[in-house]
């Protein structure tokens, strides 16, 4: 696709937003509804490969059926020079970009992001869908703080395995892949929760739980090694938050949270507790005599000055009378 090109006599390509392994994403204008949209199109070298075309079409169909505030909405699908689909245009950044641009993300923000991702995943899981590629690059944050899960291209439909998602296929991203995915085993709700656990781990510590020189070596670590406790890198981390993350990173799916909704509830509970502690500490500061003196002394001096100034002005006025 080219800048200025008109798709379906409706969508005008404005600019290239980015590209992934198999697709380009463009910003476009919907001429009928007078709004900006994003258009994802398959790269030309994949157009002749049936597996990738089916996977691309599958993403459009799957996401189109998920009408949820924490999932990017799909509006349209078609084939021009290449297959494409039209989706909601998000003003914001991926978590990958946010992580690279900020040294530390507040624990409250981490928990809020995690709760919103879990909310979106619950919507997918309730329809028998497993995302299979939860990672920072597939999570977007809007300027208002709303989280959007993207890229359902390798989604697995429970009880309906196709040739492109069947057991034995290793799909996912090495740093965030679940142990069962790394082995090519069947995926479940727990697989997405594990991947979300790796994302939360990275948001808190600055790095994924497992890293190595090659994707295969990284995936192997998910199978064979225990993650370091995140509190080793973030000493202010409350135990409840750490326990939740380590539970997500259990090697066996049954030892993780039972559902994304259960996880969401725990993350919000931990966030409320964290904010209560911060509020309590703030109230303690208000009762600290030293802090009180520090702020009230200048105010007292200013007040005395105003009184003396008023008195002096009044005195001069009386003299003139």
How does the language model describe each region?
Residues 43-65:
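AlphaC helix of the eukaryotic protein kinase fold
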Residues 14-20, 25:
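Protein kinase glycine-rich loop
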Residues 119-129:
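Protein kinase catalytic-loop region centered on the HRD/HxD motif
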Residues 80-94, 98:
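Conserved short submotifs of the Hanks-type protein kinase catalytic core
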Residues 131, 173-274:
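C-terminal lobe helix-coil module of Hanks-type protein kinase domains
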Residues 77:
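Activation-segment/catalytic-loop signature of the eukaryotic protein kinase fold
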Residues 113-114:
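Activation segment signature within eukaryotic-like protein kinase domains
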Residues 50, 143-186:
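Activation segment of protein kinases
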